[in-house]
């Protein structure tokens, strides 16, 4: 005799477990059933696990007829048990009935019921007046009738479930019927009513929920907000699990001041090592802009590998207007992003060489001047280690065609080749790398604008380069502030020689000046791209010291360096702009340190010793006593920064405070505040409170930020002109146990703003 039909009961609690992830305090939320657990005999063999054992105070059985068991009846098979006051087994019809303090238990859950009727021949069973509890979890509920079909599917009639403690049921889902398909691993719910604080809040005639950890179609958690620019907002994402390799999320977002804003995200897997994403966003007839224009976004991203050698990459974004990200909360870019990437690349890799082809078109929002398009670029690189007498040979090359959307702009084709010989010498206490390189570049330029008279039709540029880079590592044990440390001292030097050639006949296609931080002092060029290769005859001196504690954790790292120019650089970026006519570069210093167990400091400064000017300063001070507690103070100063929107030089002097702190076990606070010291105004304020209990989580936040308003290139001016600042209130609610995206987190609150949270300590542990 088998009782395998009881196995289907183990599917029931999984209805409310889909997409749940245990939290640190999950053990405090476990709800135990009110009946004691029946303990299985340990050490049973596989054969004994299948045997059925029946124990009762009294029994009356006759072969081929009814067998009656009364008084503390216990049926056991492995770790599955049925306890009842009375049980009857009709051997002729193979019907099994049990009633009176009925309890079913296995390793997954416990079910109590008034009665059980089972047909062993068809594997059907019905439990009436059922209550269930999931072991080690918080899911529990009632059912007037629980039926097990011959296919091991479940049907619950007049049922409910919750994840709240029995003495404090904050929410309860009631349903007329729930059907669980064990093979498809999904559940259907009819006439569902959600009660919050015993008050019905909404009714759903039909819904589906997952019954396993597999992705499943259904609604995700809604969110609510209100802001000065969009009005009242409500969004209700819907997730569609199309196939194992495809899914789609559709989010209708209603904004009272603008209209219906829809967002669609389609994700896919292609083969074993490729994936991609397609985003479509649309707002029809934006009511905030005169003329009510349509606003849209489409974005496609794809990356992956084709067998072991081929790599593919694609990223394409288009928006309807300059202020799209500024006005609407997109899933693709942040409000501060003003560049759209359109890149496609195919690469092939071997051990010693690689080749790639790419096209690129960067769109800068709010700027009249458009960057050049790369249509296309072919790169070929070759590497030969220990090529001859310990010398490494390298060959880098590229062929690039520069196009432009404006037919009046000049265009060009560029061929660049750079063979090199490198002698690397590595030892236990240092290294020395010497390299000679010859850079040959040819340009074929088409002058479409007569205003550029200085442009040459063809250019052949040959520039030699010599680079010697060395580092020595010293180490000692020392004591500092009554603590033992292992200290390293790492002096580093670089000599760089780059020949000079007049490059004023070459247009600017992909070149910009690079920033000078500590690591930038040891680069071999001042500009990105290849349109300008600056001559150099210079020595870079730098030193880094580190302190490691007894656990070999890096507690402090300090770096200091500067370039000594042996002769002036003759080459500028455009005409004579940015020519290097000083004896030294900025003095760059960086510090990352753990001041104590809880305090961390990060700082970086670039100081011009020639003019005694501070060129850049960044400081962050963190207090992190525990993983979920944070207080950060920050300051940033950058003078003469080019504003790409106005082409004006501006000074940045900003101070900020960011914090995340638990008020108690359930209530969490996250906030930040950034202040512009030059303009004497707040540029961003974010305050959020999150409450999380065993069965629900709710987040209420307030956001005030400065807006980056560009000139409108759709419709007419914004009604009542664009606001310089935006403020809003946001509400998110998670009811644990109803599927969706799971509990709210604190990390996303830290990054929900113009300035992402960044740890100041980048130590090599």
From Swiss-Prot:
| Keyword Flavoprotein annotated | no
Please tell me whether the keyword Nuclease is annotated for this protein: no
Q: Which GO terms describe its cellular component?
A: cell outer membrane; transporter complex
**What range does the record give for the signal peptide?**
1-18
Give the UniProt subcellular location, in the record's own words.
Cell outer membrane
What Pfam family does this protein match (any one)?
LptD
List, alphabetically, the InterPro entries matched.
LipoPS_assembly_LptD, LptD, LptD_C, OstA-like_N
GO BP annotations, alphabetical order: Gram-negative-bacterium-type cell outer membrane assembly; lipopolysaccharide transport
Which UniProt key words apply to this protein?
Answer: Cell outer membrane, Membrane, Signal
The entry assigns this protein to a family as follows: Belongs to the LptD family.
Subunit details? Component of the lipopolysaccharide transport and assembly complex. Interacts with LptE and LptA.
Cited function: Together with LptE, is involved in the assembly of lipopolysaccharide (LPS) at the surface of the outer membrane.
Q: Which HAMAP family match?
A: LPS_assembly_LptD (MF_01411)
Q: What is this protein called?
A: LPS-assembly protein LptD
Species per Swiss-Prot/TrEMBL record: Shewanella sp. (strain ANA-3)
């Amino acid at each position: 005799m088998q009782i395998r039909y009881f196995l289907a009961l183990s599917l029931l609690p999984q209805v409310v477990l889909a997409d749940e992830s245990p939290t640190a305090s999950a053990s405090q939320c476990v709800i135990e059933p009110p009946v004691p657990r029946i303990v299985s005999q340990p050490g049973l063999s596989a054969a004994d696990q299948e045997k059925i054992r029946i124990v009762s105070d009294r029994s009356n059985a006759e072969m081929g007829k009814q067998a009656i068991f009364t008084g503390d009846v216990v049926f056991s098979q492995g770790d599955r048990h049925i306890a009842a006051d009375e049980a009857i087994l009709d051997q002729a019809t193979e019907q099994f009935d049990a009633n009176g303090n009925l309890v079913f238990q296995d390793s997954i859950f416990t079910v109590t019921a008034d009665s059980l009727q089972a047909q062993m021949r068809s594997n059907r069973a019905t439990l009436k007046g059922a209550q269930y509890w999931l072991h080690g979890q918080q899911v529990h509920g009632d059912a007037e009738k629980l039926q097990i079909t011959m296919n091991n599917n479940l049907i619950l009639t007049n049922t409910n479930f919750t994840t709240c403690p029995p003495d404090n049921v904050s929410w309860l889902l009631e349903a007329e019927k729930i059907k669980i398909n064990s093979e498809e691993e999904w559940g259907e719910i009819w006439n569902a009513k959600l009660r919050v604080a015993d008050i019905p809040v909404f009714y759903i005639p039909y819904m589906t929920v997952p019954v396993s950890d597999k992705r499943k179609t259904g609604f995700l958690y809604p969110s609510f907000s209100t802001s000065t620019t969009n009005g009242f907002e409500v969004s209700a994402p819907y997730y569609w699990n199309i196939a194992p390799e495809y899914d789609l999320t559709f989010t209708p977002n209603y904004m009272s001041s603008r209209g219906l804003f829809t967002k669609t995200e389609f994700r896919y897997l292609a083969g074993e090592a490729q994936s991609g994403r397609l985003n479509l966003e649309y707002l029809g007839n934006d009511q905030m802009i005169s003329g009510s224009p349509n606003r849209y976004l489409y974005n496609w991203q794809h990356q992956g590998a084709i067998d072991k050698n081929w790599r593919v990459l694609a990223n394409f974004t288009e928006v309807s207007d300059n202020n799209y990200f500024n006005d609407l909360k997109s899933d693709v870019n942040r409000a501060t992003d003003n560049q759209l990437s359109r890149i496609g690349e195919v690469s092939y890799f071997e051990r010693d060489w690689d080749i790639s082809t790419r096209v690129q078109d960067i769109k800068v929002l709010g700027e009249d001047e458009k960057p050049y398009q790369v249509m296309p670029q072919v790169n070929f690189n070759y590497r030969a280690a220990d090529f001859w007498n310990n010398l490494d040979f390298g060959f880098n090359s590229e062929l690039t065609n520069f196009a432009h959307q404006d037919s009046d702009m000049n265009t060009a084709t560029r061929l660049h080749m750079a063979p090199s010989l490198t002698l690397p010498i590595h030892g236990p206490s240092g290294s020395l790398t010497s390299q000679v390189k010859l850079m040959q570049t040819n340009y074929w330029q088409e002058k479409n604008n007569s205003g550029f008279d200085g442009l040459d039709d063809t250019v052949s540029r040959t520039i030699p380069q010599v680079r010697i880079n060395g580092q020595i590592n010293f180490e000692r044990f020392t004591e500092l502030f009554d603590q033992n440390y292992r200290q390293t001292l790492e002096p580093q030097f670089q000599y760089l020689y780059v020949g000079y050639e007049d490059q004023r006949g070459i247009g600017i296609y992909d070149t910009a000046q690079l920033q000078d931080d500590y690591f930038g002092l040891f680069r071999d060029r001042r500009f990105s791209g290849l349109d300008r290769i600056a001559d150099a005859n210079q020595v870079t001196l730098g030193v880094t010291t580190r302190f490691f504690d007894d656990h070999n954790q890096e507690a402090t790292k300090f770096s200091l360096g500067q370039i000594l120019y042996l002769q002036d650089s003759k080459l500028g970026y455009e005409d004579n702009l940015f020519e290097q006519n000083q004896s030294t570069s900025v003095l760059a210093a960086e510090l990352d340190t753990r001041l104590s167990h809880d305090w961390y400091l990060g700082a970086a400064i670039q100081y011009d010793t020639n003019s005694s000017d501070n060129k850049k300063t960044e400081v962050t001070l963190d207090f992190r006593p525990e993983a979920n507690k944070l207080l950060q103070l920050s300051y940033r100063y950058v003078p003469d920064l080019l504003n790409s929107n106005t082409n004006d030089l501006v000074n940045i002097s900003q101070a900020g405070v960011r914090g995340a702190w638990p008020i108690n076990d359930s209530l969490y606070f996250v906030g930040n505040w950034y202040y512009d010291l030059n303009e004497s105004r707040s540029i961003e304020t974010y305050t959020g409170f999150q409450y999380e209990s065993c069965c629900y989580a709710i987040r209420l936040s307030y956001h005030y930020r400065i807006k980056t308003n560009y000139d409108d290139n759709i419709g007419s001016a914004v009604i009542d002109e664009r606001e310089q600042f935006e403020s809003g209130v946001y509400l998110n609610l998670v009811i644990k146990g109803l599927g969706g995206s799971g509990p709210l987190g604190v990390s996303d609150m830290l990054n929900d703003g113009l300035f992402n949270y960044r740890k100041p300590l980048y130590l090599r542990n």
